[in-house]
Amino acid sequence: PLGTVQKIFSGETVNPRYDTLLALEHFFEEPLEVREHVYNRYERNGSYTVDDYRTLPDEQRGELIDGYFYDMASSTFGHQSIGGEIHRQIANFIVENGGNCRPFIAPVDVQLDCDEKTMVQPDVGIVCDSSKIQRFGVYGAPDFLVEVISPSTKKKDYTLKLSKYIEAGVREYWIVDYMQEKVLVYFFE
């Protein structure tokens, strides 16, 4: 159940049952219909930089995480609709309440760690520090991020991006699984 998973990831449950751990392990290791992959064919994988990322062809959508390229397939209609609606609701809320934060929707480049090894494209985000908004996109951790998962990005969104967002200083992260009709919300200090 989702409540159990949230308690485990939040640290509330320190010693989960063995069968729960096995179920989680199976979930994260199950074979997926992978349309996204790491660029294994490149010998330099792990040492790529933002400069390499910027040389990708315009039609090639991808992310650079810790020096590794991840190919990103184009979004489905459902995926894009959910992300668009979340963005619309957030933008309306900010305007109606006179807020100064700036919402954005993919594809926007986010140089998450302010280093040369990571550039991600979250589905939706909010930046409250206007100095982070640069000509190319966002430099530094946004305050709020949303990833709408698909079968090909599930593992990366639940694990790799979760840890990257925590380390970078993102304050709130939503994982939206519209196929399961679930939203997992993380609040970070």
Question: Where are these predicted regions, by residue range?
Answer:
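Short alpha-helical DNA-recognition segment
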Residues: 1-7
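Gly/Pro/Ser/Thr-rich low-complexity, intrinsically disordered segments predominantly at protein N-termini
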Residues: 7-10, 17-189
